[in-house]
């Protein structure tokens, strides 16, 4: 199978919901008649300038307007309670003060959906706890098994790393990632350490993961509510056990999905290029939505080379770069409509009692 480093593959190659502009001129057409919504859905957003540029693209805003959705910037210099009214608050900001403000707003405005709860997002900012939900799940069925690579947390003192690695029984090479995953460029950096001496060059706090050969391909699994899309990306190349003794040093990469971008075109074995089974991804996504309390995130998944059904989750990111996801505009606007539909149902049911 031919794959360029820019190729993107969706699970089914098509949108799950095909709607024309005429059909979606009012969001009421996508909501059950028994639970009508108002004509305009107001989505307040608090995003970084980088996220605004990549996410709030003209095509998204145009499609959203056609569906009755308006994006309104939140002024973080003014009290949040004095802005709006909002149906949904969409955010990706960090800091204790912002979390406090948002939590107070959630309690005072239970009818507004905050995507996503700040405390739940915080769970993904630490790579020590990030993958614990997957590890605890121990997901295994007829479609495959999903786990996490063996890993070790080093909070300080690089001189202690070789001994800690030996005590933990980790095998070289090891992937080193910053402990804090705050969305910054630095938090996406990774290093590949081939030998004991190179471990001393690493900079704690960090997480060390055993490197799993995976054919140089990873799968980015985007979750938007209940929707799932998969994009195939190049990754770090496999490491031969036979060649390992000849390798030494630390190799640094800006992020794993860019690590092998220089590979240009590659002819991939179908067993490497094949997407993970959809039923397995649906079950994994469902369990993670419940376990993490999040609806907007993505997973970096690899398949162990030489197997068909052994998968590892190596990273989870909140509110990732959806602009890189095929047809994200349709997926995301349909998701926002479903959120408001759920709000309307709850209000209608509450009014009956």
From Swiss-Prot:
Kinase that can phosphorylate various inositol polyphosphate such as Ins(3,4,5,6)P4 or Ins(1,3,4)P3. Phosphorylates Ins(3,4,5,6)P4 to form InsP5. This reaction is thought to have regulatory importance, since Ins(3,4,5,6)P4 is an inhibitor of plasma membrane Ca(2+)-activated Cl(-) channels, while Ins(1,3,4,5,6)P5 is not. Also phosphorylates Ins(1,3,4)P3 or a racemic mixture of Ins(1,4,6)P3 and Ins(3,4,6)P3 to form InsP4. Ins(1,3,4,6)P4 is an essential molecule in the hexakisphosphate (InsP6) pathway. Residues 138-350 form the ATP-grasp domain. Mg(2+) 2 binds at residues 315, 317. PROSITE patterns: ATP_GRASP. GO terms for cellular component: cytoplasm; nucleus. It comes from the Eukaryota. Binds 2 magnesium ions per subunit. GO terms for molecular function: ATP binding; inositol-1,3,4-trisphosphate 5-kinase activity; inositol-1,3,4-trisphosphate 6-kinase activity; inositol-3,4,5,6-tetrakisphosphate 1-kinase activity; magnesium ion binding. This is Inositol-tetrakisphosphate 1-kinase 3. PANTHER family: INOSITOL-TETRAKISPHOSPHATE 1-KINASE, INOSITOL-TETRAKISPHOSPHATE 1-KINASE 3. Its cofactor is Mg(2+). SUPFAM superfamilies: Glutathione synthetase ATP-binding domain-like (SSF56059).
């Amino acid at each position: 199978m031919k794959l360029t480093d820019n190729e993107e593959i969706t699970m089914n190659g098509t949108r799950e919901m095909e709607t024309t502009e005429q059909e979606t001129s009012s969001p009421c057409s996508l909501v059950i008649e028994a639970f009508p919504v108002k004509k305009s859905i107001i989505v307040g957003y608090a995003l970084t300038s980088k996220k605004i540029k990549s996410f709030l693209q003209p095509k998204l805003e145009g499609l959203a307007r056609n569906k009755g959705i308006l994006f309104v910037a939140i002024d973080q210099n003014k009290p949040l309670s004095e802005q709006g009214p909002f149906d949904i608050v969409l955010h990706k900001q960090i800091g204790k003060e912002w979390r406090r403000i948002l939590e107070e707003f959630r309690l005072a405005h239970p009818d507004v959906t905050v995507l996503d709860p700040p405390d739940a997002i915080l769970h993904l900012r630490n790579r020590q706890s990030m993958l614990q939900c997957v590890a605890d799940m121990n997901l295994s069925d007829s479609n495959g098994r999903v786990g996490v690579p063996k890993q070790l947390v080093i909070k300080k003192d690089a001189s202690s790393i070789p001994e800690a690695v030996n005590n933990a029984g980790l095998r070289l090479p090891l992937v080193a990632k910053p402990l804090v995953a705050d969305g910054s460029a630095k938090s996406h950096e990774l290093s590949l350490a081939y030998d004991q001496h190179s471990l001393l060059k690493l900079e704690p706090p960090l997480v060390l993961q055993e490197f799993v050969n995976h054919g140089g391909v990873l799968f980015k699994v985007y979750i938007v509510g209940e929707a799932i899309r998969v994009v195939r990306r190049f990754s770090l190349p496999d490491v031969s056990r036979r060649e390992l003794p000849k390798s030494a040093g630390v190799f640094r990469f800006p992020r794993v999905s860019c690590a092998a971008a220089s590979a240009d075109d590659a002819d991939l074995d179908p067993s490497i290029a094949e997407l993970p089974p959809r039923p397995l991804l649906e079950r994994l996504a469902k369990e993670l939505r419940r376990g993490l309390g999040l609806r907007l995130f993505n997973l970096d998944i690899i398949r162990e080379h030489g197997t068909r059904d052994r998968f590892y989750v190596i990273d989870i990111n909140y509110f990732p770069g959806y602009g890189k996801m095929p047809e994200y505009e349709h997926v995301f606007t349909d998701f926002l409509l479903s959120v408001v539909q759920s709000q309307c149902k709850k209000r209608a049911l509450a009014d009956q009692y």
